[in-house]
A protein has these predicted regions:
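Generic non-transmembrane alpha-helical segments
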Residues: 17, 21, 167, 171-182
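Active-site/ligand-binding-proximal alpha/beta "capping" segment
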Residues: 174-211
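Metabolite-binding pocket within alpha/beta catalytic cores that recognizes anionic/polar moieties
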Residues: 2-160
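Short acidic/polar active-site loop segments enriched in Thr and Asp
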Residues: 110-111, 211, 230
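Zn-dependent metallopeptidase/amidohydrolase metal-coordination segment
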Residues: 215-237
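Non-catalytic positions within long, well-ordered alpha-helices that form the structural scaffold/packing
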Residues: 104-108, 206, 225
Length: 237
């Protein structure tokens, strides 16, 4: 990424490239986490752009992350989907790892759905459970909003009193009840990785209020909320 350019210029440059390739932009985006890229099979794809072709985009180095920005219809909804995300442990700065979320906002996305595979710590959870993220604990050593703040993007000191939309959580619970889907809810702990947690760390994270732990999601949510986007998060345990 060309760091000598102004951050706003980088965002605008990338958004302009995507707009030229795609045309009409959706209002909803999904970030597909580890092992969740199979959802793409249910998208009627109109345009798919490899990350390697998008100016200023990082390229995912993680196995299981294909690295494509997809535009198409999921059911009746026109969406943008990131098939593969960028992690702090890969060596990117927080600004680089969350750059796609900045671009989404520039393109007009208002609602962001984030997903991940997480380690469950709540004894009531079973492997394969779906957990709505209702809050998070940020244990990353770097913050995505550290450094110069651009008022055009959001405030210097954004509120995080509702990182995950209460409205969307309520809607998800209603749908799960209608379809008899087992749905859990809890707090996601975000850590740097790439090592998995020690038994002592698991006990610590549980004691401070965590229900699941993973190496992503939190930075993207912080950046999305900084820009006023509505966010819904889901972990696969």
């Amino acid at each position: 990424m060309e760091q000598e350019k102004n951050w706003l210029e980088l965002i605008s440059e990338t958004a302009a490239y995507i707009t030229e390739k795609v045309g009409e932009m959706p209002k909803t985006a999904i970030i597909l986490g580890t092992g969740l890229g199979e959802l793409v099979k249910h998208i009627d794809i109109k345009v798919a752009i490899p990350y390697s072709e998008i100016p200023n985009f990082p390229v995912s180095t993680v196995e299981g992350h294909s690295g494509r920005l997809i535009f198409g219809n999921l059911g009746s909804k026109y969406i943008m989907a990131m098939q593969g995300r960028f992690h702090f442990y890969e060596g990117y700065s927080m600004k680089e790892a969350t750059f796609p979320v900045r671009v989404m906002n520039k393109l007009g996305v208002k609602t962001l759905f984030v997903s991940n595979a997480a380690g469950g710590m709540n004894p009531e959870f079973r492997i394969g459970d779906l957990m709505i993220i209702n809050d998070h604990i940020n244990l990353f050593p770097e913050h995505p909003l550290r450094g110069k703040n651009y008022n055009e993007l959001g405030p210097r000191f954004p509120s995080m009193d509702e990182p995950y939309s209460h409205r969307l959580i309520k809607k998800a619970k209603e749908i799960a009840a209608e379809k008899n889907i087992r749905l859990m809810e809890g707090v996601y702990v975000g850590t740097q990785g790439p090592t998995f947690e020690t038994p002592a760390e698991y006990r610590y994270f549980s004691r401070i209020g965590g229900d699941a732990v993973g190496m992503s999601t939190v930075p993207e949510v912080i950046v999305a909320r900084h820009m006023g986007m509505e966010v819904f998060g889901m972990s696969v345990i």
